[in-house]
């Protein structure tokens, strides 16, 4: 399945990369690589993570305290957020494809 990332998620992800790069050069790049690997895994195995009661699925990153929240809609994977696991739980829950 093809994965699309909502504009809001892309902007937040860019902020996270910049924040990690400011902490240590190269750290933001490692975050980007880990998220890319997670999205590729999701594209191959989208239905493996169970759907949560609110209709989304989530894959935790292995190194960074982030997760990729997504939903499958109309045959496409929509990444709703690349969210920090300990900050603002489900702040992105109202996001939907086409609502950008």
Positions of the model-derived regions?
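Arg/Lys-rich, positively charged N-terminal/basic patches that mediate binding to nucleic acids
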Residues: 1-32
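Short, charge-rich, low-complexity interaction segments located
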Residues: 22-24, 45-54, 87-92
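Enriched for short, Lys/Arg-rich terminal
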Residues: 29, 67, 71-100
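Short, well-structured alpha-helical segments
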Residues: 32, 36-39
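Basic/aromatic recognition patch in beta-strand/loop cores that engages polyanionic ligands
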Residues: 37, 44-77
